[in-house]
Structure formats: structure tokens, C-alpha cells
Curated annotation (Swiss-Prot):
Protein name: Dyslexia-associated protein KIAA0319 homolog
Native source organism of the sequence: Rattus norvegicus (Rat)
GO biological process: central nervous system neuron development; multicellular organismal response to stress; negative regulation of axon extension; negative regulation of axon extension involved in regeneration; negative regulation of dendrite development; neuron migration; positive regulation of SMAD protein signal transduction; response to auditory stimulus
Native organism taxonomy: Eukaryota, Metazoa, Chordata, Craniata, Vertebrata
Membrane-spanning segments: 965-985
Record topology, Extracellular segments: 23-964
Amino acid sequence: MVSPPGVLSSLLLLAAMAGGSSQQCSEGRTYSDAIISPNLESIRIMRVSHTFSVGDCTAACCDLPSCDLAWWFEGSCYLVNCMRPENCEPRTTGPIRSYLTFVRRPVQRSGQLLDYGDMMLGRGSPSGAWGDSLEDLRKDLPFLGKDGGPEETAEYSDDYKELERGLLQPSNQQDPRGSAEYPDWSLLPSSDGDFNASATGDNSAASTEKLQDLTPYPLDQEQLQSLNESTWSPTPRHSEMSSMWPSSVTASPTEEGLEGEETLQLQEQPNNSSGKKVPMPSHNPSPASLESSPTTVEKSSIFTVTPWSRDPGTPTFPASTVLPGLISPSWPLSPTTSRTVKALAVSAGDNLVLTLPNGEAELKASVEPAPPADTAYTYEWSLMSHPVDFQGKIKQENKPTLHLSQLSVGLYAFRVAVSGENAFGEGYVNVTVMPAARINQPPVAIVSPQIQELSLPLTSALIDGSQSTDDAEIVSYHWEEVDGPFLGEAFLDDSPLLRLSNLDPGNYTFRLTITDSDGATNSTTAALIIRGSLDYPPVANAGPNQTITLPQNTIILNGNQSSDDHQIVLYEWFPDPGGESKEMVMQGAQTPYLHLSELQEGEYTFQLMVTDSSGQQSTALVTLTVQAENNQAPVAVAGPDKELVFPVQSAMLDGSRSSDDHGIVCYRWEHIRGPSAVEMENVDKAIATVTGLQVGTYHFRLTVRDQQGLSSTSTLTVAVKKENNSPPRAQAGGRHVLMLPNNSITLDGSRSTDDRGIVSYLWIRDGQSPAAGDIIGSSDNGAALQLTNLVEGVYTFHLLVTDSQGASDSDTAIVEVLPDPKKDGMVELILQVGVEQLTEQQKETLVRQLAVLLNVLDSDVKVLKIQAHTDVSTVIVFYVQSGSPFKVLRAADVARNLHKRLSKEKGAFLLFKVLRIDTAGCLLKCSGHGHCDPITKRCICSQLWMENLLQRYMWDGESNCEWSVFYVAALALTLTVLTGAVTWVCICCCRRRKRTKIRKKTKYTILDNMDEQERMELRPKYGIKHRSTEHNSSLMVSESEFESDQDTLFSQERMERGVLKGSLNGSARSGVSFGYYSKDR
């Protein structure tokens, strides 16, 4: 139950507050021919248009919250928010028209007294856009220097200093009178926590406006509500009267208190012999204020209390909100005796204003007078109010200093109570934490629609720019015509909406330029097409959405599905302006196909704009998603362990063999343990250097990390030993024998030994070894030498090993490569088919067909190699075996047999056309007088020897070198001579036969009675003897074969011959022979 005096004092306080709320803003002190010297970086000045007198300027300042000073300068009005006293200090100047008028506002006085500077900072700027830019102020006020103040001015030293001391800077000692006067402007906080603000209007709205003033940048409604809720805790607040005062305190509102000013109530103690007065703050807001404003501090009523009274009717006060680490105030009270308490002058320091990210502060209390020499004061700090989301740290040690950290945005009120022997005092301090300074973002101009198409008879259009955005406020819109039929300025209106009418056919382009409250601008354009005839717009089709996964970072977007009723004349690709901006490479941006490369992880949006022959356009969007590939953890490789020989004191730590699927971004070397400290260089690189090594074993750890944060570690050991080195012993592996077709081998030199370890291996091919044969990789620098493609012959390799001290040793390895025992049986079959087109199934079919042709089993045909011969032919090397045990058939016989069998087949028996069948190797002996060409498979004979042409072309056709050139030449010469002789004889015989005519043989008849004259020898004409006359001794009558000649011989004596003939005939009949005389010739 509350006592009647307490109820009466509460009613009086409410009446005083209600009376003060109705008082209006009034004019304060005025200075003529004076200016101020502000710092333009920490003051807010706004120029007001359409003011005609000093009174109008002062009225404008009264109407604007947080305006402290009305400045009339050369016919222009400027409203000033001082923020700090030195910013509004008047200075005299020359005879110019300049008047400074400070305004007075009715406020209620709070017990949490703040000095002027902190109150100005706490007020901030008014809600909305407040203050002109520095460039505009310097143009309007050219006399301001670089620091924002006048270049040469004098100060109003007396009256403004008196104003500052008496009015602007309240003293820590409270005015003992019932009220205080504030002639120029009120500097103390009102009951709702604001400073120098009008008490009229809705308290909730005023609270929101004040919170905006405390914020360096405009807040939206949600942020304001959050800040209001966090400014004052909804829990019951600490009452400034929560402690039992050691003297009687009575609430006595004065006339000034009834006019709206809340005063400090002080009353002398009747039994206090010292005569000092104890300040008693009054914190009683009106009930309406408590109910309507969420930021209003809850305070208890003030009661008349008898010191140390234990009457059950005496009211008790609510405890203050004390956070962990703070001690609730407790007062040493004696229940039986009454003592005189000495009042201490306690100051908690100036009110603080912090701006995030600075959230730390230190409060320090000072007391006057100082404690006696042998005693000390007791300090108790308590948190009176704090934001709801307060989670800061308070370091309380019952000392004069209080440490604060991790403070959030809002207002904090602290109270410190200092007590000593028969002495007590308390002080208050406010800490205001403001949000971080706002960074202005330029506005974004948005027009809707961007492209608008109309067809006659429609000639009116509307373009909406109200969707433009800004982080603060857009203050102006400006439209202008960029292209198209001229409209004139009458059609353009500087408003968010552009209304157009009576438009002529054509293409129009309008630009919208917007300006925000900070002067930043942005512009965009809108296109308007007025068509005279009906033409349907094109339909853009950018294709379906695409998704790719890294490492693939290229793709082609296809827009050729776009259509139009006439013709599309232009394709345009560009990233969607509303999407995220990522780096990429675009090619073919004005073609139907957009080539994209160097894409990164994320989502891309592209817009395709197509334009038809009449200029109509259409757009379509396509989304491309680039997904990250699965990331694997890196693999750290610190390298092999090292052994060093003292006095070597440094080593290289090589981690460059560490790997990751996306690349390693971070290396870090650490010295884990060892016999002594070492110095390391480049510990964040792949290769580090360590120095200062001593004899012993050191352990180092390498940690690698990839782009996604995955890491891996590896450990390296470095052993430093004393010098005692023996040369190494090389072992190359001895002699090895290979038999073709096996043409690969590994020579193992790892059995080489050294007392400290071999650091390098080097394999060297002997100069007399065949040049053919390949070394795989860089194995010639390793312990094992890997060889392949060896040919028939003997290879010699020398192994050279070296230890860490440079000592070396060598050894030799021999590799003998023997010919293939199946070499004589390998057949080469060339088919007209590309090697890439021959399948395994087709190969098996070919094997079966060859087995049929050769009359063997499928398993007897062994395919050794299949390789390309040309781009359109393939070589198959195989051999044929038969019998048990298996015996390889001669390649020449197999090839000859295949030739015969294939030549008998009418059609193509094999799957593919056969281009050639031959032995794989050149197997001809060449009769021991030449060698076989491995390419042409023919004998190349030695000098003086040649091929047996008969065998080559008439018999088996095998190339050979059987004939000697000498024998062939002699035989050819002999044949030539014989042929010539026979030919000459034949010619001669033919000529003689043509000159000689053969006579008929003469028939002779033996005559019995022939005289001596008649027995003369008959000779042929021209003296040629007849053979019959040489052998016949008797005369015979003959009929000459040359009757014609006889007729010719005896033609002259025809008559005589006729007589003779008659006689002869008669004689013949009678057996008498004829005679032949020479004279008859």
C-alpha cells in the first residue's frame, strides 16, 4: 500500500509533465553580423528555399527536429544541427547581412545528466535526408576555409562563453534550487530519452524519429523497430530511488516543473549539521509516456521516506537490473541510531558515444573530496538500462574503473555509488553505441517496360520508373528523349511515370536519370516502337537451361529456335543485368550460337534478344549452372629422408611433389623436434631451406592446403652424421639374355650399396651397342633401367652410382638379344581395311578362314601383331604350327599355299580384300652371293653375280643369285657367234642357189659300134663335168636335161642336124650311137 504523500507527489509530477508538453518552440539568443566556423565533416547544414525574412528562417528551424541554429546569411536561410558546441560558436565578421538565432525547445529534464557535447552526438541528424553536400555548401558559402571555417573572424568571446558555461555545459553539481533555467535551448534529455526535441505529437512516432537521428544512415521500418526494441530493456528498470536515502526526500515541483521542465529536487536535512544539500534526481515520466513509447525508461515514483524506517507501511522500491559482474547497491543503514551522512560529489565521467566496430569503453569515477589518508571509498557499479540483445562483457572489480566490451547498438545507462565512513554519493553516465557509418550505394534506375511496342491506332504510352531503387531515397526523376521523332519538352515530366500521347509511328528511345539523397545518379533507357502496320514481334528462344560440371568450362548456347513471321535480322546475347557478375569469355554474341568458355563455378543467366526486319525485338532467358567437381584432399609429400655429413649445416626441404586435384594454395613447413634450434627460410613455399643443423636427427612437418580448405601433412627426417665415408659399390645386374619377340627388360641396380646411401644413379649405353632400343621415361637416372624395343644384338650398359659425399663407382650390365625362333614362320598379310575398323570378332573370323585355307585347326593359327600399314590398310603378322610336338611351318610355304588357294577361289573368300601375302621377314638365302632386302623381300646380289632368270620367271619364281656374270657373258658371246655363223651360212647358200639352175639328167645308151672319134667325152656347157661322165667308161646316149641349151647350140646348123637327127634316129633304132664333136660347138 502506497502512502498518501507518495500518491500526492506522483500526481504533482504528472501535472507538471502534462503542462510542459504543451509549450511550443521559441526564439533564443540572436547574434547580428556574426557567422559560425563549423567543421563541415562533423556538422549538418541544410539550405531552405522560399524564406523571406529572419523570422521565417527561425520558424523553419523550429519546425525541423534537431535544428539548433537558424542562420540568415545574405538573404539565404541555413538550418544548422550543431552536434558539438564548438561547431556553433559565433564569430564576428565585417558588415554583412548575417544573423544567428538559437532556438529554445521545451524538454523534460532527466536525472541522467549529460554534458552538451555528448547530447549533441546523441541527437544525431533528423529523420530523412538532412544536410547538403560539401560541394554545394562551399559554393554557397565561399568564405569557408579548407577546414570548413571562415578564414579571418573574431570570436564573441564573452557572451557565447557565458552561454556555453551557463547554458550549454551543465555542471556536475546540481542546482540547489527547485528548478533550473535554460535561456537559449534545452540541453538536458527529456523523459523519452531525446534531446532538444518537441514534446508534442505521438510519443511513439517521436521515439522512432529520434532513433533515426541517432543512426548515421537512414533505417527502414524493420531496422527501426529492432533498434527501438533493443534500446531499452522491457524488464523493470532500476529506479533512481531504489536505494534508501539517508535523509528525507520530498517531491516538491516548482512553477518551472509545472511548465514542463523536470528538475532536480533538493532538500536540506534538518538534522544535518554540515548544512550541505544532497542532490536528489527525479525520474517520473507521465503514465502516457510509459505506455506509448517502447523506448521510455521505466521509473518508479518518488516517495517521502523517513530514514531507516522499518514501518511496514513504508513503501519499498524495485531493484535495479544488474547484470552478472555488477553489484546491486546496498546502503549501510543503522536500524536504531540516526547519523549524519556526508554528501560526496561523484562524477562518472563524460557521456560516451561509440561507433561500431568500436564496442569497447572504460568508465572511470572521480570523487570529491578525496578519502582520508587511512581509509578508501567503496565503489559499486550498476547497469540501469541496456538494449534487449545486450551480450557484452563488463569487468567489475569494485574499483573506480569499469571496463566494457562487445557492446551492441543502443543506449546504456550506468550508475556508480560511492560510500565511505559517514559519506555517500553517486553519479551517472550514459554510453551510446551507434551503428557503423553507412556507405552510400548508387541508385538503380529501372523502367517498365523497357521495350514497348504499339500499333496504330494506339498512340499513347505509359513508362513506369517508380520501380527504381536506392538504399536511401530517390529525390528526383528526369526524363529525356534520346532518339525518335521529336516530341518537345512539353511531353516530358520529371515524375516517376512518363505519360505520352499522340505519338507518330517510329522508334522512340527515352532516358530516365534518377538522383538519390546523396547526389548519386543512375540512368537507363526505354524503347517505344509505334508501328503503322500489323507485324507480329519475333519470339526469342534461348534454349533449355543447361548444367555442366567442372572441369568442363565451355558450352554453346543455341538460339536458332527463335522465330518470326517475317525474318530475324539480329541476334544479341548478353548476361542478364539482374544476375551475378562473373568472369567468362563470350564469342558469337551477335549470332544464334553463343560460345562460352572459362566459366567458373556458379549460376549464369544470359538474355537473348532477337530483332526482326521491322525492328521489333523479343528476349528470352536461359540459365547455365556450373557445378563444382568433387574435391579430393591434397596429398602432402615432404620428400625422402635425408642424411647429411657434418660439417654440412643446411638442407633443402622439397615438398613440390605434393599434389591435389585442384591445386595446392598453401604450404607450411614446421620444425617438430631436433637436437638444436634451426633457422628456416621460405616456410610458406614448396621448397624451404633449413640452416644451423648440428649432429643429430631433425624432424620436419609439411602441411599443404587446397582451395577448398582440405589439408594433408607429411613428415621428413634429416639425419646429420659425422664424416666417415666409404665409396659406394655398384651392381648393375650382370648378363641377361632375351629372345625375340620379347624386346623389353629391366636392369636392376638397386643392389648397389653405400654406407650413407646412394644419392644418384646414372645408366650409360656403351658406344658399340646397337642404337635401336628405347629407355622408358627417365629411368636412366634411377636404380632400375627400363628398356624396350630392343633388336637383335648385344647391348652393354654402364651403371654409375654416387653417394652424398660425391664418391662414385661403376658396373656393367650386358643384354644379349637373340633372334626369334619363329622368325622363319611369320607371315605378313596385308588387308584393305583401316586398323581402327577391324574388330576383335572380325579378327577371329579371319583366323578361322585362314585355318580353312591352310587345312589346319583354328588354334594352330597364331596372330602375333596387328598394326596399321597405311590409312586404309592393316598388316596382320601370324605363324602356323602343326604336328605334335608343335612345329612352325615355313613362312614361304604358308605364303605360297595361301597364294594358290586364294587364286582358285572365284570370289573374295576372306572378309577383306587381300593386298599382299609375304613372309614377315626376308628369308631368302640368295645362293650365298648376296643379301635379302627386308623391304622388297628380294635378293640384292653381290658384284659379278646375278639372278637366275629361268628359275625366277619359269620355275618357282624365288629370287636368287645363282648365275655368275662371267659365265653368263661367255655363254651370251658364244651364242652370239654361233648365231652369226649359222646366219652367214644360210645367207650364202640362199644366194648360190639363186644363181645356179639345175639341168635334167641325161640318159645314155651304150653303143656297140663306136669309133674312136665318137667315143670322145661329152662335156656339159660352160665346161662343167657331169658326174655320170666321170664314172662311166663307156659311152652312153643320154637325153640332156638342158634340151633348151642344145636347141640353142645347134640352131645354126639346123639343117645338118636334121640330117644328123635322122641318121641318129635311124642309128638309134639300129643301135648306132651319136657323136659329139667340138667343132659342132
